[in-house]
Amino acid sequence: MKKGKKLYEGKAKIIYATSDKNLVIQYFKDDATAFNNLKKSTIEGKGVLNNRISEHILSNLTQIGIKNHLVKRLNMREQIIKLVEIIPIEFIVRNVATGSITKRLGIEDGTVLKQPLLEYCLKDDKLGDPLIAEEHILAFDWATKSELEKVKKMILRINDFMIGMFRGVGIKLIDFKLEFGRLKENGKNEVILADEISPDTCRLWDSITDKKLDKDRFRKDLGDLIPAYTEVAKRLGILHEQSNLSAVNVTKLRSVKKRK
């Protein structure tokens, strides 16, 4: 499949056109940002790991009936994905209180929530991705009521699945961000899961030590990000357990194939 012109560049990914008008290529960058782009860096190998981890999670979600934009991983940094119209909302799912919510509401960090909490933020870097209510979404036609109801049902299933998946490898799923888009097929729009699911978009803590295995390592200067992301990939079975990876050699990873 031929890669065409660049259609869009965000903080962590670039979208390219292809020879198929219904498909695009998603390229994972090594750029790391935090605090609405106020803190920036380039971390060699981050894009490779996020590509592999997101492919693994989205593929597993497909198996349980969660339709998403992933078609296949093209190479170490790129995926072929379905072209969707992104709904301009970030859906934040919280299982444990940490980060901005603790400051906003004066809640003790690490408080386990009685049930998953869903928050909405408008995707707008210039405005700082402000927190909004469901009424805002409906009032400004960012999504319809039926679209929101479908998204909420998908989110509950995704959360249940991911909690179990990570728990099985000794990781607590603290919170995560999801994005959804409208897929146009046969003249109709269908809302599906889009973007990525990776340590860039999730907070992941070791189940025993509470060690941060996500982008908070960059946000809070807790140490190198690559070993933490590599640890997540190893635990999920994406990489050989014996692999000792660094930011230098991570880009040379090859696909792990099951032995017959």
Curated annotation (Swiss-Prot):
Keywords, comma-separated and alphabetical: ATP-binding, Ligase, Nucleotide-binding, Purine biosynthesis
Reaction it catalyzes: 5-amino-1-(5-phospho-D-ribosyl)imidazole-4-carboxylate + L-aspartate + ATP = (2S)-2-[5-amino-1-(5-phospho-beta-D-ribosyl)imidazole-4-carboxamido]succinate + ADP + phosphate + 2 H(+)
E.C. number: 6.3.2.6
One BP term from GO: 'de novo' IMP biosynthetic process
InterPro entries to which the protein is assigned, alphabetical: SAICAR_synt/ADE2_N, SAICAR_synt_PurC, SAICAR_synth, SAICAR_synthetase, SAICAR_synthetase_CS
Pathway: Purine metabolism; IMP biosynthesis via de novo pathway; 5-amino-1-(5-phospho-D-ribosyl)imidazole-4-carboxamide from 5-amino-1-(5-phospho-D-ribosyl)imidazole-4-carboxylate: step 1/2
Superkingdom: Bacteria
GO cellular component: cytosol
Annotated transmembrane regions: none
GO molecular function, one term: ATP binding
Family statement drawn from the similarity comment of this UniProt entry: Belongs to the SAICAR synthetase family.
NCBIfam families: purC (TIGR00081)
HAMAP family the UniProt entry points to: SAICAR_synth
Descriptive protein name: Phosphoribosylaminoimidazole-succinocarboxamide synthase
Taxonomic classification: Bacteria, Pseudomonadati, Pseudomonadota, Alphaproteobacteria, Candidatus Pelagibacterales
